[in-house]
Curated annotation (Swiss-Prot):
Annotated protein name in UniProt: Large ribosomal subunit protein uL11m
Annotated keywords: Mitochondrion, Ribonucleoprotein, Ribosomal protein
Gene: RPL11
Keyword Ion transport listed: no
UniProt subcellular location: Mitochondrion
Domain of life: Eukaryota
Amino acid sequence: MNKIIGFIRLEIESGKASPSPPVGPALGLRGVNIMQFCKEFNNRCKQLNIKDGVPVPTIITVYDDKTFSFKMKTPSITYFIKKHLEISKGASKPGKENFLNIDIRSLYEIAEIKKIDSNLDIKSICKSLIGSVKSMGIKTIIVKN
């Protein structure tokens, strides 16, 4: 078994891994074959049907023989919230102004996606999501049918 010499954490846009920064320099410092990583990452994005341009948090494990393995995670909570609400950023003064509302059902759907990466139950993930939207100046509402 190869010895692990390090971990590299990067957020890479799906389908767009290339030797340019931040990927190239981070992998080059550890002696990893950059082009091989880029090809494998982009191929895995295609296999998983991840849309191009989605930021994918990636943890790359580098071994002593300069080989690597990597794990892709789901995008950040803020990415999903901004995408759902079609905004580019949160409020400039969160806590003092709420400029948008989000339905609790939408947060539940995001929590279902984030559950893949987490050991937490869905209730805990939803609580975390509520805190995230609050820090972005977004109010959580319950819509009754």
